[in-house]
Amino acid sequence: MVDAAFDSDEAIRRWDLHARQIVAYMDPEEGDPHRIVLLNPALFELLPDVNGKRVLDAGCGEGYLCRKLAKLGALVTGVDYSREQLAIAGERTRDRAALGIRYLHGNCEHLDVLDDGSFDIVVSNMVLMDLSDHRAALEGFYRLLVGGGILVFSIAHPCFAAPVHGWVRNENGAKLYWMTDHYFEEGAYEQSVPADSEVGLILFHRTLSNYVRTLLQTGFVLLDVVEPKQAEEMLEPYPRFRDDLRMSHFIVFKVQKP
């Protein structure tokens, strides 16, 4: 259940604690299987042409998305609050000078180190639900974008990642259906990730309407929404994702600063 004692600093402390273990499962160029199968196709469906554009990867983690964007010609700045993740990003970006990627340490809730209107595009991949103050982050992204600039961000789908959720199974262990409960109980809760750890990562649960209303109140114009669905051709190399056709783990928004 939710715990008011958790904040962004505690969330990042846990990311630092588990960074090496989590990143071990991530391909340096494509990310983990969920990103490969679901998130990357959705993000790049919504992103405009990034060639020659100033792009902020807000919450860049180990930097795989920075590297993908830079190879498409983007001028990339990656920001993350986890110093351990940034250290890994530096290790994995061997050709950083050629790619022109700039990695900075910073909290996405307070990006004062970056100038107003300094980016054409902001992308934030699975970050906002890790922050205690998503409104501050969205207001910061709005400030950093030029007029007409685009924000594309993904989050754990609030409807299916409520404080209580998971597969309900029969006596033989077969999956019957995905259950969610306490959807309207907003706040932080501890996840069972990594699975073998006594100290899990923290997710700040908010309703879907909370996210949408905050976007509109910040001044963004909603352009598109995608609930990523795995392509049939991805099920052969990743058969475990077939059950995920029964619900949506993620939701991806495309919004614009007028």
Go through each PLM region and give its residues.
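Core SAM-dependent methyltransferase catalytic element
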Residues: 218-220, 238-258
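Short alpha-helix
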Residues: 202-225
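A short acidic, Gly/Pro-enriched loop at the edge of an enzyme's catalytic core
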Residues: 109, 113-121
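Class I SAM-dependent methyltransferase SAM/SAH-binding core
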Residues: 56-58, 62-110
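Conserved class I S-adenosyl-L-methionine
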Residues: 1-51, 64, 68, 85-88, 150-190, ...
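A short glycine-rich, Lys/Arg-flanked "PGG" loop and its adjoining helix->strand segment in the class I
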Residues: 135-150
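A short SAM/SAH-binding and catalytic strip from SAM-dependent methyltransferases
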Residues: 121-134
